[in-house]
Structures are given as structure tokens and as C-alpha cells.
Amino acid sequence: MKLPQLCHLAAVPLAFTLLSFNASAVSPPHPTGLDAPMISVSSMNANNYAPVETVKMFPAPKKGMVQHILTLPKLENETDYMVEIQIGQTQLVDCNKHGLNGQLKELTVEGWGYNYYQVDEISEGPSTMMACFELAKKEAFVQIPDELTLRYDSRLPKVFYLPEGAELRFRTWKADSTYQYSK
């Protein structure tokens, strides 16, 4: 392949990337400069619960529930970041689109005013009904319909109560662009 053709092939995706959506899912560099996960995660159930100083005001997990705690490190420009949360399960699925039923509730710690999130139960949800071959099954994350996008705020951990067997998946978004104005 000649160099001009190769440059043309590379220019089209590059132009599309530069001119499209101005926010991207990123894991910002860890504040220590190490190549480490930015958000630290801990989880406790009713059997191994031990109150931690930073989250002792939140209720202990009830039997059958798991408390997930996301601790965000302090960043210089936290207003440029958001945290996207998805709740679901990793399941063996066929070629159909699958979903789960469950309701994400935002609750408040009485007397403190701090928010936390809870899903009481998760059950099988809707699915398309295409004809699939049994051999085509693969593992995939199947989520409840509710998604949550939170402003990045390192002052207080994000606390979630989910049924045992549920997974909490998250990623950090950073705005790459400046504000546009309409007058």
C-alpha cells in the first residue's frame, strides 16, 4: 500500500475522533503518579462488617446484602469529572439483548444528610427473543435499567447496598472540552 493511501486511511478515523463527542471515559492518572486504580473499593456483608471511621454513620448491611464503598481520591479539578455507576450481574448470555429488573433507590442517613444508594432485589428482566445457537453463549455484564452518574466529590465515599451476587461497575468520565456559549 502506498504512503498517501495509508495516510488517507488514517486521517478519516482521526478526524471523526477529533470532531465527535467531547467527553470520554477515562481513568485519570492516580494522584500519586503510580499506575494504580484511581477509585478504591471495599465491600462488606452482614458477617464480616466492621465499621470504618469514614463510613461509620451509614447503616450496617443487612443479611443478604453487601455494602460497597467507593472512595475517590482528591483531584485538582473535580468539577471536570463524573463517576458513572452500573449495577447488575455477569451472566452467560446468548445473542439476545438481556436485562435485569431492579430499582436503584437514593436514601439519606438520618441525622447526617448523607446520601447512599440501595437495590433491594434483582431478578431476571426482559430479553429479546431472536433464535440463537446454544454454542454462541458468552459471559457479559447484564444490568438493571437504572444508571447513575454522580459528580466527582472526594469529600465523602459513595456507599451502595446491593443483594449478594450483584456487581457494581463504575468508570470515571472527564470533560475534555471547554464550554460553548449560545447567546
Swiss-Prot record:
SUPFAM superfamilies: Ecotin, trypsin inhibitor (SSF49772). Homodimer. Keywords: Disulfide bond, Periplasm, Protease inhibitor, Serine protease inhibitor, Signal. Its main location: periplasm. The keyword Kinase does not apply. This is Ecotin. GO terms for molecular function: serine-type endopeptidase inhibitor activity. General inhibitor of family S1 serine proteases. Belongs to the protease inhibitor I11 (ecotin) family. It is found in: Periplasm. It comes from the Bacteria. Disulfide bonds join C95-C132. Pfam families: Ecotin. HAMAP family: Ecotin (MF_00706). The keyword Disulfide bond applies. GO terms for cellular component: outer membrane-bounded periplasmic space. The record marks M129, M130 as: Reactive bond. Residues 1-25 form the signal peptide.
